Amino acid sequence: MNGGMSSTFSTEAGGPGAWIAPLAAGLPELGELDLGQLHRFDAALRDLRVRFPIDAGVQPALRSERLLRIRHELAASGHLAAAVATCDGGCGRPGLVQTMMQFICGYHDIDLRDATGLGHGRLIASYASAAVRDQWLPRLLGGALAGIAITEAHGGSQVHATTTAAVPRRDGSWAVSGTKSSISRLDEAAVFCVFFKDPAGHLTAGVVDAGAAGLRRRPVTPAGLSGWAWGELHLDGVRLRQRDILARPGTGMDLVREHFAHYRPLVAATALGAAAAACDSVAAHLGTREKAGFITAPRDNALITLGRAYAQINAAMLAALTAQRLSEACDEGASLWGCAAKAHGVDVAYAAASELALLAGAPGFAADSQLAKARRDLNGLLYADGIHDSLYRAVGRTLTVTAGLRRPDARVPLPRIAQDQQSNFMPGTGPWARDQVTGQPPSNEITVPALIASTHAAIRRASSGITRSAT
């Protein structure tokens, strides 16, 4: 139950809590323990930002160093692993806790997007061999960072066209060579999850120590998202043992789909947190100007812009939370929702921050302004982890491919509670009823499992190859 959430996250306190409290009212998965965790995390992050400033004026190298320090501090205080599964060494809180933590991180600074959780290290937790898990999970839970290397010069939306390839060695291992582009955490990552073509020509993923022989880096200065080093990762005969393969050879595309179905809603939540901060900052700015007598009252167009941003940010956040729920449930629609939630969430966040910046006046466009930095970072997120037009295209393709499988006269299934109530009074009826002889659903019904089964292959085809590794 989360009925007492207001005592944990007061809407009067401002900050991310004022946004999270009403959202949490519709999330029965989050209890008082979780809301208390989020409140303490927000307070810890505020304190760490004072101790280790990462504002827009801080030099990139120093910001990177401080961001890693913040991650290690959060690991030591128990925040990093709050929503990591217990089987992976974490506290096992609901996955939506991580989504909310990402929102809080974005509210403070998008560069804090890797402050908690396993990030791309989740691939290691979920698919690595026992030996590799034992090698890396303790380090990741202790604050080490995992990077991902998918994108190449031809772009990140064509994973099937990967040219990085492995050749067999005499000792049974593989030698991987190629160049990965737009790689974030270039210098900070302790380990990389690298995608390449195996000797049979199939997309495969493996775990590569950041200190492995044959790795070379070429940094590139990004226009935003500059908290971590960014650039090219060159692999020249990097040795990969059988135990280093994620899942099994040839499953690379499946790993991409599953991982980013989980990861993209987190990106959306981070972006929306930054937009929420911009909304609060501009509202406070207008209030200050009114109290000082510089304006008699905010103009209608300013109030409309604030109100529209508030509505859109909350709506997009609800979509991101739904996408995360589907991912946690291993729902077949998780990849589709992940694409839509990330693209829409970042679009909303970027548009809101851009429009709100106009209300802040000249200070909002200073290079060292946090609002200006948020706009630069949000612009970067339009491309990172799936460029928005490719994600929208994947969603549209899925909808057109599966349209013929959806009957327009199909009944909408009742909510589970309503189903239970109905079955108590009318046994054998309702959208989940089954024929007493065949045990099958009535012929005039479409059940969710049946729809999922019929659309699974279409969704997999339509969403293939849609990713990017810039964050």
Identify the function of each model-found stretch:
Residues P53-A61, G287-F294, I313-H344, A357-F365:
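C-terminal helix-coil-helix/basic helical segment that borders enzyme active sites and/or dimer interfaces
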